Amino acid sequence: MRVGVPPQIPRPSLNSAPSPFNPQGQSQITDPRQAQSPPPWSYDQSYPSYLSQMTSPSIHSTTPLSSTRGTGLPVITDVPRRISGASELGPFSDPRQFPSISSLTESRFSNPRMHYPATFTYTPPVTSGMS
C-alpha cells in the first residue's frame, strides 16, 4: 500500500482580511509626551574637562601629633602597660567561673551512648486491609 501526500489547500494570506489587531482606516495614536530637553552635560565631553571640575585631594599625614587624643584618653597601645597584673590574665583563670564544665568530664559518661535509653522495637498498629 502506498501512502501519498494529500494535496495542499492554498491558504489565504494573513493580511487579506482586516483583523481587530490591525485596524485599517484609523489614524496612528499620537504621543502625548513632549520631547525632553537635552541634559546640561554632554557625552561628547572629554575626560580632562571632567577632571578639571574636581578638586585635587588634600594629603594628610598619618603620624599622630601626640600619644593622647583630642579627648585626653590614652592611645590603645598605652593601655596594656597600665593594667595591673596584666601578665596574670588568661582565659578561664578562675575555676569558679564555669563550674558546670567539670561535670561534663565525669567518668559515668565514659561511653557517649550510655545516657541514652536502650534501643526499642517499634510495632506499627494493626489496621484492617485495604478497603
Curated annotation (Swiss-Prot):
One of its GO terms (biological process) is positive regulation of osteoblast differentiation. The modification Asymmetric dimethylarginine is found at R11. Residues 13-36, 43-70 have a biased composition (Polar residues). GO terms for cellular component: cytoplasm; nucleus. Keywords: Cytoplasm, Differentiation, DNA-binding, Methylation, Nucleus, Phosphoprotein, Transcription, Transcription regulation. Phosphorylated; probably by MAP kinases (MAPK). Phosphorylation by HIPK3 is required for the SPEN/MINT and FGF2 transactivation during osteoblastic differentiation. The keyword Transit peptide does not apply. Residues 1-10 form the Runt domain. The keyword Acetylation does not apply. It comes from the Eukaryota. GO terms for molecular function: ATP binding; DNA binding. InterPro entries: AML1_Runt (IPR000040), Runx_central_dom_sf (IPR027384). Residues 1-75 are annotated as: Disordered. It is found in: Nucleus; Cytoplasm. Transcription factor involved in osteoblastic differentiation and skeletal morphogenesis. Essential for the maturation of osteoblasts and both intramembranous and endochondral ossification. CBF binds to the core site, 5'-PYGPYGGT-3', of a number of enhancers and promoters, including murine leukemia virus, polyomavirus enhancer, T-cell receptor enhancers, osteocalcin, osteopontin, bone sialoprotein, alpha 1(I) collagen, LCK, IL-3 and GM-CSF promoters. Inhibits KAT6B-dependent transcriptional activation. Heterodimer of an alpha and a beta subunit. The alpha subunit binds DNA as a monomer and through the Runt domain. DNA-binding is increased by heterodimerization. Interacts with XRCC6 (Ku70) and XRCC5 (Ku80). Interacts with CCNB1, KAT6A and KAT6B. Interacts with HIVEP3. Interacts with IFI204. Interaction with SATB2; the interaction results in enhanced DNA binding and transactivation by these transcription factors. Binds to HIPK3. Interacts with FOXO1 (via a C-terminal region); the interaction inhibits RUNX2 transcriptional activity towards BGLAP. This is Runt-related transcription factor 2. It comes from Equus caballus. The lineage of its organism: Eukaryota, Metazoa, Chordata, Craniata, Vertebrata. The gene is RUNX2.
